[in-house]
Amino acid sequence: VEEQVKNRLVKPEMPFFGKEILEMAIVGLLQGENILLSGSKATGKNILAENLAYLFGRPVYNISFHVNTDSSALIGTDTFQDNEVKLRKGPVYQCASYGGFGILDEINMAKNDAVSVLHATLDYRKVIDVPGYDKIELHPAARFIGTMNYGYAGTKELNEALVSRFLVINMPPLTEDLLAQILKTSFPEIKPAALEQFSGLFLDLQLKAQNSEISTKPLDLRGLLAAVKVMKGGVSPQMAIAMGITNKCFDIFEREMIEDIVMTRIP
């Protein structure tokens, strides 16, 4: 790894739990393929992507896609520097040059014409042709990992040509064992009774969301971990869960439903 990008070697906060998925992703990347992680909220897509970059010892480039993402945001744009017009390199350009792992976050949020600039980068050509500048060859270690939530508000259907350039891994929903492992890793001193109740609460919400009884807003693993963290600071469990999970529903009827589910686990 080159000296100027060593600060991009980031150790993930948490390991990824899920041997089979991890093996599939590692083998795919070793064979020179790019990976697309598809799954609903709280399935660990970004955690897996960060862990893969760390395991391979490559710099990480996080590229968040949104409706206004265009090719200049990915590859770069002209800028004025030292009385000259120069190319300000975008994250995809840098990732390709330094052999990084580009995490294309919420890849289905961008317009398809913006993402089409990646086509030559992701297939057998492995080049980026920058108009008015050089053609750059992809570093042999460079890989791209896309993440997406299918069917969420603001998302679009992915272009078939783009999907064909990825190996797609469907991330399974969290199980009780995985959830317990995550909580124990984050909070080693957590009591078994509390562990059971928090895991149970999250799984109850996950089941309700899968059956379309509630939205996915309260299905928030980051929120649950933050709530446990706040409890360590002395806030009551009810108030902490309200901040981390319940209050993320702004619809009053749904919030009451979530409060009832929470009440069965944390009286």
Predicted features and spans:
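C-terminal engagement/docking regions of AAA+ P-loop ATPases
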Residues: 8-9, 237-267
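The conserved phosphate-sensing helix
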Residues: 214-226
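Short, amphipathic alpha-helical segments that act as regulatory/interfacial helices
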Residues: 29, 203-206, 225-232
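AAA+ P-loop NTPase catalytic core and its hallmark functional loops
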Residues: 1-203, 210, 236, 264-267
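Residue-level signal for secondary-structure boundary elements
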Residues: 191, 207-214, 236-239, 252-253, ...
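Small/polar glycine-rich anion-binding or flexible loop at a beta-alpha turn
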Residues: 46, 223, 243-246
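A short, ordered amphipathic alpha-helix with a cationic face
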Residues: 169, 214, 232, 247-248
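Juxtamembrane/interface motifs at transmembrane-helix termini
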Residues: 199-202, 216-218, 259-262
